[in-house]
């Protein structure tokens, strides 16, 4: 009997795990959290998985279109942001993805190797400014590279690297560092940003257009850089090859001491056209050289060349840090966090966001990029608003205003949302996938901007644009107030029509389309009421009708077990649903934005269902057994828990994001987290992730419930 009983328990457990997607190591913990003491909660707030690596650390000046990436292989690259292109324009997209990128790599020692990214350390200046240091240790040599970039003018940035090594052995050692400078097609050098990071010797690609002449670096006939020795011998190495035996011959005694053995994937056996720096170094002594590059090789002037020669690494580093301090003034939010490095994090997240706002020098506005790498050219207005609204709370009004100028430039500009609309006149478009919620999101940001800034000129300039956007939403929801032929009321009554809801969903998706259309409409009504606009009264009635129609549908989407479906099921053959978005684009925001009270019985049942059947550990955005859509869902739930006075649950939503929603050495946020693979860091850095964490940090200090 005992054996049969054990088998029965096993099979029941397996079926339960299959149905609910949990294992013993990943149980939902929220239901019991409020019953625990704070000491128990704090004890439980430990690391169970490895935080993500910093994969893409941006170090370029604020608002530059020449993004400069530092990766954990100590590689630095310049990748241009081509502005105002559409994700639906194949030719534009192909051109952007195959553009020529500047890439600078380093190989250490002799025979040479590239660093194993899992063994490097990255740091920010003062732990918050994107002036970076990367270091590595192998064969008793400590390698350290400092990276800084400063703007010279609207078209040019100077990148400056101080490269050094220290002999930490007890005997004289030859230090050798090779620098490979090349320009490569982006889609041939860099992987798509949903692919886990890797960097092996296959990335060490030949490039024959760069040459060193004395201390000047040329691309063809164009001066692009300079190398300066502090105490190393510098020379151009045209060609040199090594064999695996040469690497294996130095296997011992290195492995006895645990440092320096180079596995095959990091060996660079064929050297072609590199800058070589070499020096015999005494124990505990160091050797250095400086590498300077003009990152935009297509727009180099005599002024740029003169600056290249005159500016030292110290000059560039000091100016870079000074420029990163500029946004923080007496008119912006000041905080004083005493624990957990919150002060540094709060600064870093704001600077990362400002780096993602790309300056259009002609039109004087900022294109709000979502970040990442492969799709940095496109604007998702939904994500841009999540990135920018919290910046209003920090007082960064100018940057938000210039970004609003860009977002509203997409109104009636040829980038409309896609759906079965009566018209798109007045709608706000987007250059990324054409989500239907962009107009509501743009309204939310614009109206909150006025609420925070009281910018009267903005009100005068934007009133007509806001009204056009409001009338578009109202026109579309009025058009669906049609009964069925038998006189019954469809669930689509009074809601937004069939539309593209997200990157993977199309149909009647209340979760993505209606919730945020309502949110923007409500913000607009509050704005119009605050300025006593003539249409405010009638629009308030329309808003409440929309709320009523939404509540009718939501009650019918709610199931007996508490689950609320995110979409209205119809027989339309064009419906698309990304199954892995079911637990990411969720119905929780109906309470976050105020469509329904979180204390209502319907929503309490939803909370119970979600905590027991969807949440895993303290993650709220499960995609599968390993991967979680991080920060977004936790950001939805934190204010709900605060409204309910469930402080420990609110605490854990933020702590989960701080632990697993970003890298810890350089505070780089990302879209998803993989329990097993910290090198999986898609969309890093992540603009909306920055904003949501800033929002949650501020909510933890001060939360204002409109009721």
Residue spans for each PLM region:
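Extracellular glycan-targeting catalytic surfaces
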Residues: 268-269, 279-281, 291, 317, ...
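Bacterial Sec-dependent N-terminal signal peptides
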Residues: 1-26
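Helix-terminus loop motifs that line ligand-binding clefts
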Residues: 124, 128, 364-371, 392-498, ...
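Conserved oxyanion/phosphate-binding beta-strand-loop segments in alpha/beta enzyme cores
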Residues: 120-133, 331-373, 604-605
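Active-site acid/base region of carbohydrate-active enzymes
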Residues: 223, 227, 232-242, 247, ...
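The feature captures the catalytic groove of carbohydrate-active enzymes
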Residues: 270-282, 286-313, 372-376, 419-441, ...
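Active-site core of glycosidic bond-cleaving carbohydrate-active enzymes
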Residues: 377-401, 405-412, 464, 471, ...
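Terminal accessory carbohydrate-recognition/targeting modules of carbohydrate-active enzymes
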Residues: 25-337, 706-707
